[in-house]
């Protein structure tokens, strides 16, 4: 890619910060602006030598390409100034597509499991081939002359329709983001449109009915555990140390693979990685070694030992994700009591899946529900945290003032789940736990 100067409006956003770092790695000049509030993306940007400025139209200079963050409207002062100056303005997805076009690219899509699968694929490929990658947990790495580009393709507001990758992985199709999609059929239509933009091949989870019905123009390779899947995991053994399985392509055994990750979804995610590597003729012995070395991505089953407790931080905010996270915790800690602190994320999502949230959370031994985290677009709604508690036997409400309730538990697992600001509850608990000892 020709070296350019990029100015990010909203550079502290998770995806924006990752993309900024990737473009900087590729030799471009990168800077941007955002609000004053401290974020976890700030230090990595500083480490990369990327200036983060306060909003000011005077920041803009001739020749800059302005990347407009999704949260910033056309009437934002810097966007207005950029238009007056005649600068090129493009979205995050449009900017990612420019990187996609210069590599053998693999876009990972799915209602759930995108970040975990992207992180796993990026880790594996980058240790066996030159690979650039962009992960939804805020990590972006650019490698000059890379063979591969691995990136997360988000379906929200149809952002992934900007992309035309060589390959796509589709982990599942589910009705999420009820503030944008009308129903499951609407979501499936978007995935199918994205699939038609893929150039070489598509890897899709075989048990997903919507993915089985895809009408696309490239070969679809199904992965899973069923006999009719193209790539199949068999003889799966799950223990507190992780999972081991035999991988097959059709009737051909590709090898025995081990991952130190938990839950059935982790087996499926790793099988998708094996499938991509096989189709690109990468040495599977190297893939085997790198799969065994992977420990996970940020905010996806991130563990910490404090006193006699296991504290887990997880991004789960949809019933399917909650079920998968609880399954993973049961696998790794089969003898321990499992306590979940859940922060509902947006009123519309809670209202759309209230019953399903109740069913998934009821798999834990004890559940505490925090106040609802509303989005910028949605600060209230017709549903309450109490409505969810009523569906979960023995559940209780909790907030920062009552976080000490959790100190009653010993030698147990506490999982903090949510996509909002659940960390504030987790940080309070950890501080109290360290005091308790």
UniProtKB/Swiss-Prot annotation:
One of its GO terms (molecular function) is ATP binding. It is found in: Cytoplasm. Coiled coil: none annotated. It comes from the Bacteria. Pathway: Cell wall biogenesis; peptidoglycan biosynthesis. Keywords: ATP-binding, Cell cycle, Cell division, Cell shape, Cell wall biogenesis/degradation, Cytoplasm, Ligase, Nucleotide-binding, Peptidoglycan synthesis. It is an enzyme of class 6 (ligase). One of its GO terms (biological process) is peptidoglycan biosynthetic process. HAMAP family: MurC. Belongs to the MurCDEF family. This is UDP-N-acetylmuramate--L-alanine ligase. The lineage of its organism: Bacteria, Bacillati, Bacillota, Bacilli, Lactobacillales.
């Amino acid at each position: 890619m020709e070296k350019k100067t990029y100015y990010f409006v909203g550079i502290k956003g998770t995806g924006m910060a990752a993309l900024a770092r990737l473009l900087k790695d590729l030799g471009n000049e990168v800077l941007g602006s955002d609000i004053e509030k401290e974020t976890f993306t700030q230090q990595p940007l500083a480490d990369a030598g990327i200036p983060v400025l306060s909003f000011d139209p005077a920041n803009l200079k001739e020749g800059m390409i302005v990347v407009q963050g999704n949260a910033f409207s056309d009437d934002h002062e810097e966007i207005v100034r950029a238009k007056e100056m005649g600068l090129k303005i493009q979205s995050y997805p449009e900017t990612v597509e420019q990187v996609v076009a210069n590599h053998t690219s693999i876009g990972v899509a799915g209602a759930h499991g995108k970040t975990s699968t992207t992180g796993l694929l990026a880790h594996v490929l980058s240790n066996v081939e030159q690979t650039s990658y962009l992960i939804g947990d805020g990590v972006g790495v650019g490698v000059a002359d890379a063979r591969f580009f691995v990136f997360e393709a988000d379906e929200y507001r149809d952002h992934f329709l900007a992309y035309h990758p060589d390959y796509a992985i589709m982990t599942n199709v589910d009705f999420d983001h009820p503030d944008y999609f009308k129903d499951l059929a609407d979501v499936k239509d978007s995935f199918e449109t994205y699939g038609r933009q893929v150039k070489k091949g598509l890897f899709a989870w075989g048990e997903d009915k919507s993915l089985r019905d895809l009408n696309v123009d490239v070969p679809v390779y199904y992965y899973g555990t069923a006999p009719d899947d193209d790539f199949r995991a068999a003889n799966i053994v799950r223990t507190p140390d992780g999972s081991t399985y035999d991988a097959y392509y059709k009737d051909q055994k590709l090898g025995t693979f081990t991952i130190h990750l938990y839950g059935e979804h982790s087996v499926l995610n790793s099988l998708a990685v094996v499938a991509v590597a096989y189709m690109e003729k990468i040495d599977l012995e190297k893939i085997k070694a790198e799969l065994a070395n992977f420990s996970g991505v940020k905010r996806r089953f991130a563990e910490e030992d404090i006193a006699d407790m296991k504290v887990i931080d997880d991004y789960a905010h949809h019933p399917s994700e909650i079920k998968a996270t609880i399954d993973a915790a049961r696998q790794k800690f089969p003898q321990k009591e499992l306590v979940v602190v859940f922060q509902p994320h947006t009123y519309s999502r809670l209202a759309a899946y209230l019953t399903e949230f109740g069913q998934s959370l009821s798999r834990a031994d004890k559940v505490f529900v925090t106040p609802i985290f509303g989005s910028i677009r949605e600060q209230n709604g017709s549903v309450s945290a109490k409505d969810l508690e009523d569906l979960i036997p023995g559940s209780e409400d909790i907030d920062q003032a009552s976080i000490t309730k959790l100190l009653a538990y010993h030698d147990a697992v506490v999982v903090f789940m949510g996509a909002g600001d659940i960390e504030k509850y987790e940080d309070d608990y950890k501080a109290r736990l360290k005091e308790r000892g």
